Amino acid sequence: MGRFIFVSFGLLVLFLSLSGTGAGLHCPSDWYYYDQHCYRIFNEEMNWEDAEWFCTKQAKGAHLVSIKSAKEADFVAWMVTQNIEESFSHVSIGLRVQNKEKQCSTKWSDGSSVSYDNLLDLYITKCSLLKKETGFRKWFVASCIGKIPFVCKFPPQC
């Protein structure tokens, strides 16, 4: 009986120490887990709007990737480098610059604000991408109609 209580208590302590760390959250196969989100590069070539639509169909809350920190940018760059087909040199991300009523606005496709800025150039009504020549670490703006691979991101559900 004492051993059972000891083991049960140990398991309870382990469970409580892991709660809130992403334990129990799982990404589908072929997706990567990082900082409470799932990520995946798709080597299909789509324009920005089609890629965003495609991402939203992958899972609840999915969008083109939003990048909130330098560490997340490093993770995305690593994941893209590991999984992009050799012939591709760009991938779409969820950042879009729009000019509405002569007011420029920059937002991620998930609706969140830009809190980490890694843009090299800024133009009106453009979409953002990562380039191979920078190790997929710097953001560039480009036409939203170009068809290139893209990265999706979503928060996993319990």
UniProtKB/Swiss-Prot annotation:
DNA damage in keyword set: no
Signal sequence bounds: 1-23
Residues in C-type lectin domain copies: 34-158
Top-rank taxon: Eukaryota
Localization terms from the record: Secreted
Gene Ontology CC entries for this record: extracellular region
Family annotation (InterPro entries): C-type_lectin-like, C-type_lectin-like/link_sf, C-type_lectin/snaclec_domain, CTDL_fold
UniProt keyword terms in alphabetical order: Disulfide bond, Hemostasis impairing toxin, Platelet aggregation activating toxin, Secreted, Signal, Toxin
GO molecular function: toxin activity
S-S pairs: 27-38, 55-152, 127-144
Tissue expression: Expressed by the venom gland.
Primary location class: secreted
Protein family membership: Belongs to the snaclec family.
Task performed by this protein: Snake venom lectin that activates platelets by binding to the platelet collagen receptor glycoprotein VI (GP6). The indirect activation of integrin alpha-IIb/beta-3 (ITGA2B/ITGB3) also induced by the toxin is upstream the cytoskeletal translocation of GPIb, FcRgamma (FCER1G) and 14-3-3zeta (YWHAZ).
Record's miscellaneous remark: Negative results: does not act by binding to GPIb.
Quaternary structure (record): Tetramer of heterodimers of alpha and beta subunits (alphabeta)(4); disulfide-linked.
The protein's name: Snaclec convulxin subunit alpha
Species of origin: Crotalus durissus terrificus
